[in-house]
A protein has these predicted regions:
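Non-heme di-metal
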Residues: 2-216
């Protein structure tokens, strides 16, 4: 299936595109879309399906082992908990192998867009249908949980899109006004419109700075 990317806002459309198509995000016309080069050499093959199955299996195993580690730790089995966590990290790397083979690991802007679209699907479609199905079968408490999680996924999408805008406009480390920057490594504070290229205290690079936030 072909993928077309809006040159204005970055929205990705999958499948055929009619001449009168309008971008659902910025309303740009079909002439503002460009075809995305396919990075998956396994597209359309049984191997591609196997790679997705392997990725899903390893990802689920990683989460399960993390949960199992918590149970073991609470029961007093420190070594077993540590082994569960170590294996979970192994599974994470296995999943990464298959995800990269599928060509799904892009640059930060692409990853933010991909993440935002995934969250959008979850709160607008997936959990909405799950909640309806649960209600139809009498599982009202679970339906409420599905809707509660959907509301959270909506905020996740909004956050990813805001971060994507920062990346695209080069505003991650440069703001329009004076703000308080904090080094994530040593805690050094800088009052400025832009984060320093290097922390003057611990010498960590600009990438370690973020706008200081207080929630206490």
């Amino acid at each position: 299936m072909q993928k077309l990317k809006c040159k204005i806002c970055g929205y990705v459309h999958e499948g055929a595109m009619e001449a009168d198509f309008k971008c659902p995000i910025c309303k740009a016309g079909a002439d503002k879309f460009e075809k995305i080069e396919v990075k998956n050499p396994y597209a359309g093959t049984k191997t591609e399906k196997n790679l997705w199955a392997a990725f899903a299996g390893e990802s689920q195993a990683r989460n399960k082992y993390t949960y199992f580690a918590s149970v073991a730790k609470k029961a007093g089995y420190e070594q077993i908990a540590a082994i569960f966590l170590q294996t979970a990290e192994n599974e994470k790397e296995h999943a990464k192998l298959w995800f990269k083979a599928l060509g799904e690991l892009g640059d930060t802007a692409e990853n933010l867009l991909h993440a935002a679209e995934g969250e959008n699907y979850e709160w607008t479609d997936m959990y909405d249908q799950f909640a309806k199905d649960a209600e139809a079968e009498g599982f009202y408490e679970l339906a409420a949980q599905f809707r509660g999680v959907a509301a959270i996924e909506k905020t996740h999408e909004e956050r990813y899109r805001a971060l994507l805008t920062n990346v695209e406009t080069k505003a991650v480390f440069e703001k329009s006004g004076i703000v308080m920057w904090e080094c994530r490594n040593c805690g050094h504070l800088v009052l400025s419109a832009s984060a320093p290229e290097k922390c003057p205290v611990c010498n960590h690079p600009q990438s370690y700075f973020e706008i200081r936030k207080e929630n206490y």
